[in-house]
Design a protein with these regions (language model features):
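Conserved Helicase C-terminal RecA-like lobe
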Residues: 1-7, 27-155, 235-236
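RecA-like P-loop NTPase motor core
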Residues: 1-19
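Cytochrome P450 catalytic domain signature, combining two hallmark sequence patches
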Residues: 17-29
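Residues at the starts of beta-strands that form the adenosine-phosphate
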Residues: 94, 119, 162, 190-192
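SF2 helicase motor core recognition
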Residues: 105-109, 131-133, 143-190
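A conserved SF2-helicase RecA2
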Residues: 170-236
Length: 236
């Protein structure tokens, strides 16, 4: 759930630029929505994702004089996700946390360390080949990864058995490959997977019959459809 009304309203205005969201057309007149219309559909998709994860990812688009300028200090999702991980920090299971953005990775790492988890590693596009080898051979309590660069080609089954997706990926096979990093031969523990999706239930719609959805909910629904299609094709 959204912990800040301003954070919810900002995401709601951004989502109003996406037809599938069913957000009330009255939100399209906002200053931020107007900016996004000029930037095009792909920009709206990116900003909608960022608004669900961490508003500070939008700080350059929001501007200092915007009514949403204070929202950059909020992140309902990261508050929930990191608290959830911290509640499980003493269960003896290594954790893989998959993110999309570098700033998101930095924030997750900082929050986990502040919560008392000392051994937190990072693997993203900034990691060199030599550093990568060290990361892969070090046993961290939590390893935070950028999903697009670390979903394949690495074996992590020896140290990790919990997987967290902070935001869904458009391609379900990317997530399946990410899970495969530790759900493979040699894994001695049950692997648990946690996915986090922001809801649009609190967003305003034009009619009572409409149901507003966030980009994350939309992607999650498309993932399920793709998996069902794949299952039918394989069964036949």
């Amino acid at each position: 759930p959204w912990q800040s009304k301003e954070e919810q309203e900002m995401s709601e205005e951004i989502h109003s630029t996406l037809r599938f969201s069913n957000v009330s057309t009255s939100k399209k007149s906002g200053e931020l929505a107007q900016k996004l219309k000029k930037d095009g559909a792909f920009a709206s998709l990116l900003r909608a994702r960022q608004s669900c994860i961490m508003p500070s990812l939008l700080k350059h688009k929001i501007g200092k004089n915007s009514k949403y300028s204070g929202v950059v200090k909020c992140s309902s999702k990261l508050d929930y996700v990191t608290n959830f991980i911290l509640e499980r920090k003493n269960n003896g299971k290594g954790k893989l946390v998959f993110c999309h953005f570098r700033e998101e990775i930095n924030q997750v790492v900082a929050r986990l360390k502040a919560g008392g988890i000392e051994k937190v590693g990072i693997m993203d596009g900034r990691v060199t080949a030599d550093m990568r080898k060290k990361v892969l051979t070090t046993k961290y309590d939590v390893l935070v990864l950028q999903i697009q660069t670390c979903c394949e080609g690495i074996n992590l089954q020896d140290n990790y058995s919990e997987i967290y997706f902070i935001s869904p990926h458009w391609n379900p096979s990317i997530e399946d490959q990410a899970i495969g990093r530790c759900h493979r031969i040699g894994q001695k523990k049950d692997v648990e997977v946690f996915r986090f999706v922001m809801s649009g239930q609190e967003f305003e719609t034009d009619t009572e019959d409409d149901e507003a959805v966030t980009l994350e909910t939309y992607i999650n629904n498309r993932q399920n459809e793709k998996r069902e299609i794949g299952k039918v094709l394989l069964d036949n």
